Amino acid sequence: MEHAVAPCVLYPGTEPGAAGESESEGAASPAQTPCSLGASLCFSSGEESPPQSLASAAEGAATSPPSSGGPRVVERQWEAGSAGAASPEELASPEERACPEEPAAPSPEPRVWLEDPASPEEPGEPAPVPPGFGAVYGEPDLVLEVSGRRLRAHKAVLAARSDYFRARASRDVLRVQGVSLTALRLLLADAYSGRMAGVRPDNVAEVVAGARRLQLPGAAQRATDAVGPQLSLANCYEVLSAAKRQRLNELRDAAYCFMSDHYLEVLREPAVFGRLSGAERDLLLRRRLRAGRAHLLAAALGPAGERAGSRPQSPSGDADARGDAAVYCFHAAAGEWRELTRLPEGAPARGCGLCVLYNYLFVAGGVAPAGPDGRARPSDQVFCYNPATDSWSAVRPLRQARSQLRLLALDGHLYAVGGECLLSVERYDPRADRWAPVAPLPRGAFAVAHEATTCHGEIYVSGGSLFYRLLKYDPRRDEWQECPCSSSRERSADMVALDGFIYRFDLSGSRGEAQAAGPSGVSVSRYHCLAKQWSPCVAPLRLPGGPTGLQPFRCAALDGAIYCVSRAGTWRFQPAREGEAGGDAGQGGGFEALGAPLDVRGVLIPFALSLPEKPPRGEQGAP
């Protein structure tokens, strides 16, 4: 009977030409010479034990150590062949092909290591296991195979955090596909510690994708939160692109949130803004404008009495102006003003103009501090405040230094109108970061004091010695036009646009009239921008809770109402809608006192700005 040939297990002979091997070679049958190698290196194995001569030779080889000149090249292969009955997971790694008859060699790695190298040449890495886990869970009882490497973990830890591992809790060896080795290491560290460390913009996409594949939603959110502070103009678009390719909504929204929070920087960067689609650009701006909740704010600028008549040549009050140069936020629930931020160093606090564009507060021009000659001069500096990051930054300076200017926002541009003894007007394009001249004010318009607002895509400026002239600027034609003037000759406090109307607030009584001659009051008239017609809105009345004397104030529109702010108090004016009965005087509106006065020095300029809410705001979804 011919015996089946077993695979050869070859060793270099200590003496290739040793006596006895040649004699046994001649006595062997053809079935006993199964391979083409020299007969002195082969033996056959049947169902019974091999012939005595071969057994003696094998016993001699086992008892005598191999010579130093010949390394061991082949082991007993029949033991390795028994691995064919193992599962595919056990065959995936060379370490699983251990002989069942031989005890497994103890691992040379410390117990705190999670990773078994696939080959002895590759070193292992320390495990991200917090102290005390070994005592609680014992030795790792799960082997994770990924990218040819093996990681050890505890089934109980992973099953408690993931349905994916809970459904596979019966397996001792688990091959993980679709997740990179780097991502799996970070996810395991997060599963043990609850902290996502080591996430960077260049690997966050694979970490979030791995967390979704392994059903670790908490890890995906922590990875997104961890990479948020690392986003910048240099990497935000790459992160967004990776998130869109892999449909990672959390990461995509984080990139959109960064871009909307830093909208001006993104707008000026062609490598980012130029690669966004039109829908994405609209989404960023929409998120920016709807972020948080709109609040009433007021900037304290310049000392008291320094409104429209302070000349740049006078250096008095510079130090005092800097002391109260801050922005305050009105908290309606508490009825009080609280400081939000202070003007940055280098921003003049007297005679500057301010407005809001893209939910940024811009401050431009003003009276610069006195120079070496002791004379103050107009400033050309421009700064902007970002409420999303609570930070100030410098913007391209004006082409011409200005004080007592009016700064307005219209159709995504800034307009610096006039100034003391100036008729010129310039426009700022935030995307190009450039100021450019536009049509100047008509000659003989007004030298210093004027009010300005925007309505229906046009700029309206009122001024003159008696504040009765009204001019309109059409940006499409780049020209100024004369509008019907108001019949009022009272001292104007401010002018603000709301719902297609321009509301003008006048302090009753002429400039030279004594305050004791009669009660002080405020009259309101409005101009219909389409009908081009003035009409009275509120007859002169005293502000509720206000002082007996006239107090100049400034106005801002917010949530369908107009807020009047001065150092004496804060009032809300609610115009009557069409067809409604009037307010205090029966002519269409009334005043309501709000909170306590703001105890600061200087002129208060109110405006509306959206401040971030907690938790982080943002419009979910994508175009």
Curated annotation (Swiss-Prot):
<feature type="modified residue" description="Phosphoserine">
    <location>
        <position position="107"/>
    </location>
</feature>
<keyword id="KW-0677">Repeat</keyword>
<dbReference type="InterPro" id="IPR011333">
    <property type="entry name" value="SKP1/BTB/POZ_sf"/>
</dbReference>
<dbReference type="Pfam" id="PF01344">
    <property type="entry name" value="Kelch_1"/>
</dbReference>
<keyword id="KW-0597">Phosphoprotein</keyword>
<keyword id="KW-0880">Kelch repeat</keyword>
<protein>
    <recommendedName>
        <fullName>Kelch repeat and BTB domain-containing protein 11</fullName>
    </recommendedName>
</protein>
<dbReference type="InterPro" id="IPR006652">
    <property type="entry name" value="Kelch_1"/>
</dbReference>
<feature type="modified residue" description="Phosphoserine">
    <location>
        <position position="67"/>
    </location>
</feature>
<dbReference type="Pfam" id="PF00651">
    <property type="entry name" value="BTB"/>
</dbReference>
<dbReference type="InterPro" id="IPR052310">
    <property type="entry name" value="Kelch/BTB_domain_protein"/>
</dbReference>
<dbReference type="InterPro" id="IPR015915">
    <property type="entry name" value="Kelch-typ_b-propeller"/>
</dbReference>
<feature type="compositionally biased region" description="Low complexity">
    <location>
        <begin position="79"/>
        <end position="91"/>
    </location>
</feature>
<dbReference type="InterPro" id="IPR000210">
    <property type="entry name" value="BTB/POZ_dom"/>
</dbReference>
<feature type="compositionally biased region" description="Low complexity">
    <location>
        <begin position="12"/>
        <end position="31"/>
    </location>
</feature>
<feature type="domain" description="BTB">
    <location>
        <begin position="140"/>
        <end position="196"/>
    </location>
</feature>
<feature type="compositionally biased region" description="Polar residues">
    <location>
        <begin position="42"/>
        <end position="55"/>
    </location>
</feature>
<feature type="repeat" description="Kelch 2">
    <location>
        <begin position="360"/>
        <end position="412"/>
    </location>
</feature>
<feature type="region of interest" description="Disordered">
    <location>
        <begin position="1"/>
        <end position="129"/>
    </location>
</feature>
<feature type="repeat" description="Kelch 4">
    <location>
        <begin position="458"/>
        <end position="500"/>
    </location>
</feature>
<feature type="repeat" description="Kelch 1">
    <location>
        <begin position="311"/>
        <end position="359"/>
    </location>
</feature>
<feature type="repeat" description="Kelch 3">
    <location>
        <begin position="413"/>
        <end position="455"/>
    </location>
</feature>
<feature type="modified residue" description="Phosphoserine">
    <location>
        <position position="64"/>
    </location>
</feature>
<feature type="modified residue" description="Phosphoserine">
    <location>
        <position position="87"/>
    </location>
</feature>
